[in-house]
């Protein structure tokens, strides 16, 4: 019985977060709140786009993939970026169970389009997040 109750609590778990830009709700004027899939998508993007040493009290947070964009874009570089993303999400976003990470190089714009497909235990369908990694000077 306790196992069934625990399972139902896990299935009903709701994740909430504030959007990065802290925009107000157009009708109520309150801060918008992201929930469930949207909250986890934002968290995944935050982890991927954060470089090491950007967080003062947690210097190992992030994936540090933006530094790899200054390397020559070869299949080995794409593989390294994919593995860095997979490792950082495994360490810093335990709610996301990574199913697939695909990269597509865009040499003309010096960018890399990353598609991350993951699932969440409490949500029935998989979620996809697209992140465009660009070189910033």
Residue ranges of each PLM-predicted region?
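Immediate N-terminus of the mature polypeptide
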Residues: 1-82, 87, 99, 104-137
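Short secondary-structure junctions
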Residues: 90-98
